[in-house]
Amino acid sequence: MAKAKRAYVCNDCGADFPRWQGQCNACGAWNTISEVRLAASPSVARNDRLSGYAGDNSETKVQTLSEIDLQEVPRFTSGFRELDRVLGGGIVPGVAILIGGNPGAGKSTLLLQTMCFLAANMPTLYVTGEESLQQVAMRASRLGLPKDNLKMLSETSVDRICQIAEKEQPKIMVIDSIQVMHVADVQSSPGSVAQVREAATALTRYAKQNNVSVFIVGHVTKDGTLAGPKVLEHIIDCSVLLDGGTDNRFRTLRSHKNRFGAVNELGVFAMTGQGLREVSNPSAIFLSRGEEDTSGSSVMVVWEGTRPLLVEIQALVDYSQLANPRRVAVGLEQNRLSLLLAVLHKHGGLQMADQDVFVNVVGGVKVTETSADLALVMALLSSFRDRPLAKDVVIFGEVGLAGEIRPVPSGQERLNEAFKHGFKKAIVPAANMPKGGIDGMQIHSVKKLSEAIEAFDEL
């Protein structure tokens, strides 16, 4: 009997090493390398297992780009316009999609609803390894979903799943979840780095060779990132994250990698008694402001994927009783907040060194683009002076370290979106000022932070 081989794999990034060492050379993490035993297999079987990854098993040949037959890939809808938007316009045949999210976010519910919709028109297969078939059927009954056409399978062996799928010939398949799947050639427990990597590789290879779209459910760590080795995200074609806790009825689906569409595309859903329902106008739920004007609140226009989104940002500036005042940012980068406070002090003359500063993006949206800088500065100024901004004012623009206001992409589209939602005034960078203006909208163009503060005083 052939002797099992040993390998040493980093639990964070999945890098391989010939022997154990304290630090991973690939990602720099300490004490993350563990031993993995690989079952010995015949060379022929191993070569067959590794061949044909990017397509069918036909004879490979070298071609020039001009010789490749370009055909429009026919996408099919998932039944959710928001999910289709995040995926780039629909589901591509043969794609491997990794969907992650916190426990209770609604990953299994979203995929079950999608599969029940697709089962009416094409063969489908839902593979569950975490729940029994009875539990999935109970959820489908509770949600009022049709159960006649969707085929179910309770299995955790990737080899048997691929064998059954070869017999059933589904066009789309769900694997729930990758952390409980195992490959026979890897002698380690399910969920380990080696098992997750080999299982994802086998499922992606099956998707490419058979032109089957595969949804793979993945767990997340306590900091909200996808669990497992980083190589997992390199193997699959599309990576999306469903965000939203059990205390929030709204869920946001964001793409972090997409070989067939735009990244950072955002889809919004609402969790109801009948499952997830898409939100056609996300700006409305993020702008649920009170009737009275309050200080420390401003509205910005952020660009999420391929569409603008109006989001409210709130700031609270108050005298601190601590030696080191607190700086808390929810939905924004902490370092960005510290940077803007320094710019306000240097170029705006506002001293907040003895103030506690709390910033929150309403609705649980996470904003990463720099177009939110000017709106955040205006919210801080409003709270510091205890003077509210008018409700019909929208603000966007990037703030530089020298106090200059830099332009942002798609300025005209942002203003049009704000005007469509009833905003009559705007503070924008001078370079984003429309040439002909917008009828019915008063636009203040600013080049420096001092000009933005003057515009705040005029509104």
Task: Report the location of each language-model feature.
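Peripheral, non-AAA+ core regions of ATP-driven protein-machinery
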Residues: 2-12, 16-85, 92-98, 105-123, ...
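P-loop (Walker A) phosphate-binding loop of NTP-binding proteins
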Residues: 102, 129
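Divalent metal-dependent catalytic cores for phosphoryl transfer on phosphate-bearing substrates
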Residues: 133
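Conserved RecA-like ASCE P-loop NTPase motor core of nucleic-acid helicases/translocases
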Residues: 124-128
